Amino acid sequence: MKQAIPLETRVITALANHERLLQQVGQMKKQIGAHLAECPVMKKANDWSISAQDSKDIYDEKTGLVKTHLWGAFNELVEGSHGGMVRMNLDDQENYLTDPWCDETRCDHCYAAWRVIQDRRDVRQELGQARRTLRMLGKLALRVMP
């Protein structure tokens, strides 16, 4: 017969898992920043000696974000299956960043950042599950408290 795990043990385990995932997301955020800092476009954007025209080409007018290769992968529009213009799917984004025949869009640093972003998406889903587990344990604790 399976023995029930004490509530206190379940709560501590859930809290530790939640904290581990939060720290992992924070580390991934730093990794993304480090990879993007190595992108040639980002390095050019941080150069104070660039011309006004180059500066205009490097920054997005609407958001003010640097138009890194990763920015291009997330914002480039392609023709959708129904004829309209849509953003690229994950496969198209990966091809955009790794195309060996296109030096304009290929960037190993932006691709590394993109990979971490995809992994972070999975960790955030785990974090959501960890939050739901904590909530469930909290409700259970309220029921057993006098």
Label every model-predicted segment:
Residues 142-146:
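Short, charged, intrinsically disordered terminal tails
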Residues 2-49, 106-140:
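Contiguous, amphipathic alpha-helical segments that mediate oligomerization or scaffolding
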Residues 76-121:
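Amphipathic protein-protein interaction modules
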